[in-house]
Amino acid sequence: MDYKTAGVDVTAGRAFVERIKSCVEKTHKSEVIGGLGGFGGCIRIPKGFESPVLVSGTDGVGTKLELAQQYGCHFGVGIDLVAMCVNDVITNGARPLFFLDYIASGTLTPDALAEVIEGIAAGCCQSDCSLLGGETAEMPGFYPIGRYDLAGFCVGIVENHHLIDGTKINCGDQIIGIKSNGVHSNGFSLVRKVLSMANVDENTLFGKDKRNLIQSLLEPTAIYVQLVEKLLRENLPIHGMTHITGGGLPENLPRIFPSGLSPHIDITTWEITEIFNWLQNAGDIPEIDLWNTFNMGIGFCLIVPKNEVNSALEICIKNDFEAWNIGQVVESQNNSKNIGIFGIPS
């Protein structure tokens, strides 16, 4: 009996690291010290910072992985993994510095996992972020053969006096909603339940590019790093930012609000992405559950002074992101931060 007989092929693991090395090292910026394969990844703090603050975030892709593995779509979930982490980190005004990944599988499937790493590297390139290292764990008997799970970890950096934490949000500020790519990486337990029901036509087409149902559902999460960087470079006074993930707008938007203030949005100000209408109709999902589960077409929000709305929208549009003024900041009752939503049928 040996380790390979028990289900762990160490030689294949080493070969896999060599296979992905060039892909990973293409993401490395000048601050990276050394290459792939050490015990720890090393990186210098970029020059020019006087009082840097490090901002960290960690996340996974959830049960979207089940659907992706079912249909052999591995590259996109690599992008999803990066997006879920970097989009959180940038809400504090930080720019992503480095990313780490963790992949666990029942048995090493080099082709599928190489696609995942290629997707992670692509997401890091979109985020101007170095893929500093990672871990690939082969765990026979723990995960089914052919199945894998992902986790990611990102660290960003921002000057202390440029940190955005919501404390500057004022009554009367406006809420800019930036379009999502679709479902992103949340709510897939409900999505998969809908797909398991009878009479689901996977050939239903969505959007201008006429993608089928599965392609639309597996569209990678939008990465907002470059857009936020350009907004900040224009010295736009952003009082708060939120990444709309699990729990949708009702759960995520109020998280950064100071006591005594709450968001009020008007859902008639943007067109709900058609994939959500399909999910509601196919699964007979109550309206309130839809809003409390999915992003409903808004993947990221900015909170800005009223007189900066046009500037914010212009920068978004100039950088190929659809965006709308979807609401405003109001005084709340009893210091509640609960969101007010106009337009949901009772």
UniProtKB/Swiss-Prot annotation:
Q: Which GO terms describe its biological process?
A: 'de novo' IMP biosynthetic process; adenine biosynthetic process
The membrane spanning regions, by residue number, are none
A GO cellular component annotated for this chain's UniProt record is:
cytosol
Reaction(s) catalysed by this chain, per the record, are: 2-formamido-N(1)-(5-O-phospho-beta-D-ribosyl)acetamidine + ATP = 5-amino-1-(5-phospho-beta-D-ribosyl)imidazole + ADP + phosphate + H(+)
Q: Which locations, inside or outside the cell, does it occupy? A: Cytoplasm
Major subcellular site: cytoplasm
A GO molecular function held by the record = ATP binding
The reply on keyword Ligase is yes
Record keywords, A-Z: ATP-binding, Cytoplasm, Ligase, Nucleotide-binding, Purine biosynthesis
Concerning Pfam families, the annotation shows: AIRS (PF00586), AIRS_C (PF02769)
Pathway(s) where this gene product acts: Purine metabolism; IMP biosynthesis via de novo pathway; 5-amino-1-(5-phospho-D-ribosyl)imidazole from N(2)-formyl-N(1)-(5-phospho-D-ribosyl)glycinamide: step 2/2
- EC nos: 6.3.3.1
Q: Which SUPFAM superfamilies match?
A: PurM C-terminal domain-like (SSF56042), PurM N-terminal domain-like (SSF55326)
The record, for HAMAP family, names:
AIRS
Concerning its family, UniProt says:
Belongs to the AIR synthase family.
Put simply, this protein is called: Phosphoribosylformylglycinamidine cyclo-ligase
Q: Which organism is it from?
A: Prochlorococcus marinus (strain NATL2A)
